[in-house]
């Protein structure tokens, strides 16, 4: 059983398990300088990720393409909302340059929502994948895409470029969508993930949710069932952390042993991989997890 030692957020003090070291290493600085010199955005900075110090010190970064202005206004997200800039046609080349210079074995590419573009930015994702494949053929590629709501088959443009991992986050339970993710539709996100798997079963599919927003345990388990019905391979579960006072409140800080409980249940439901901890984020340890995913698939085949 999981503990009842969950901490209500009204205390406004983060528990010890959510405290991380400030980023000061030389490796962090060199990663930061390279990303700035190539004029790339990262979700690490834009979304105020708590793991930025650890990841950048290991030369891991999640690049955010298609600008830094989002057309949505999700209640949990730190990315700016407004009218986006024009698509930078040279960005795929600069991204491939960064991958090559950092010597990345695994790269994660995400983006803001671009409801203003006819395909939601899907063709730009595909160009980024193509450029990286040409210049760094041994690098595995993971995409974390928007939901491409009302962009018919836009996901297929990305899938045809054959990323190794296709990630799209479900983010929260259905009952909280209007409050947390009002511009999205739960079943649209589920369908996207399922369609990718139907299109090419060799592409690993991945999704994640945040907890601590007011969901119940039963609702979290139901999301697991829905994702397994969509044949999702990899589930991530992490604590929601409020980026600023203008964002939705944290309902509670979920104790580490409750995350352990979720991980055990998710594994029993058939996910190939599960990462569940207070500081888990979609791209956290993504390269290591990809290698484990490949091993797990081989074991299942054998």
Curated annotation (Swiss-Prot):
This entry's comment on the bound cofactor is:
Binds 2 [4Fe-4S] clusters per subunit. One cluster is coordinated with 3 cysteines and an exchangeable S-adenosyl-L-methionine.
Q: Does the keyword Metal-binding apply?
A: yes
* Keyword Nucleotide-binding part of the UniProt annotation: no
Segments forming domain Radical SAM core:
56-272
* Swiss-Prot/TrEMBL keywords: 4Fe-4S, Cytoplasm, Iron, Iron-sulfur, Metal-binding, S-adenosyl-L-methionine, Transferase
Chief subcellular location equals cytoplasm
- Binding residues annotated for [4Fe-4S] cluster 1, in chain numbering: 44, 49, 55, 283
Q: Where in the cell is it found?
A: Cytoplasm
Pathway field of the UniProt record reads:
Protein modification; protein lipoylation via endogenous pathway; protein N(6)-(lipoyl)lysine from octanoyl-[acyl-carrier-protein]: step 2/2
Which Enzyme Commission numbers does its entry carry? 2.8.1.8
Provide a Gene Ontology MF annotation, just one.
metal ion binding
Pfam families the record matches: Radical_SAM
Which cysteines form disulfides? none
Which of this chain's residues are annotated to bind [4Fe-4S] cluster 2?
Answer: 70, 74, 77
What is stated as this protein's family in its record? Belongs to the radical SAM superfamily. Lipoyl synthase family.
What name goes with this protein? Answer: Lipoyl synthase
